[in-house]
Amino acid sequence: MVTLSMSANAKEKKNFDWSGVIKAIIKVESNGNPNARNGNGKCVGILQITPVLVKECNNILKGMKSAKRYTLNDRKNQEKSMEMFILYQSKYNPSNNVDDGIRMWNCGISAMKDKSKGRKYLNKVKKYMDGGN
């Protein structure tokens, strides 16, 4: 189970299992290649994490009064990449809505308000969640 221990904000955040979603996103984003880069080189690793997302995760940690910080190299580390995914979800998708979380990963937090964003990506990820190759 892929979870991230946070402060005692909400038990559901701590116990929600994102592993199936993360596994499908990894398949879509990099096919499991930790050294994958997109065409412009900004998105890196199994989850194709941008420098902006690393910075946002560090801002979230700072707001939690945590001393932990992520580096750009952490995008190539599977465990740390998954931690960043879960941290981002815990901040911007506290209800753990899977569809919102998938769309948000692809389109950013604006996808939380505009449900039309990321539909194609959502369908692609859900295909892998449902056992597609």
Predicted regions and their residues:
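Bacterial N-terminal signal peptides
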Residues: M1-T3
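Sec/Tat signal peptide C-region and signal peptidase I cleavage site
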Residues: M6-E12
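Extracellular/periplasmic catalytic domains that process cell-envelope and extracellular macromolecules
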Residues: K14-S19, N40, S95-V98
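Short, functionally critical alpha-helical segments immediately adjacent to catalytic or ligand/cofactor-binding
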Residues: F16-N33, I49, F85, D100-G108
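Short acidic-hydrophobic sequence patches enriched in Asp/Glu that either
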Residues: D17, G45, K117
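Secreted/periplasmic proteins that engage bacterial cell-wall peptidoglycan
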Residues: A24-G63
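Secretory-pathway/luminal and periplasmic proteins that interact with or process carbohydrate-rich
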Residues: S30-A36, G108-R119
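Alpha-helical segment that forms one wall of the substrate-binding/catalytic cleft
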Residues: P51-D114, L122-G131
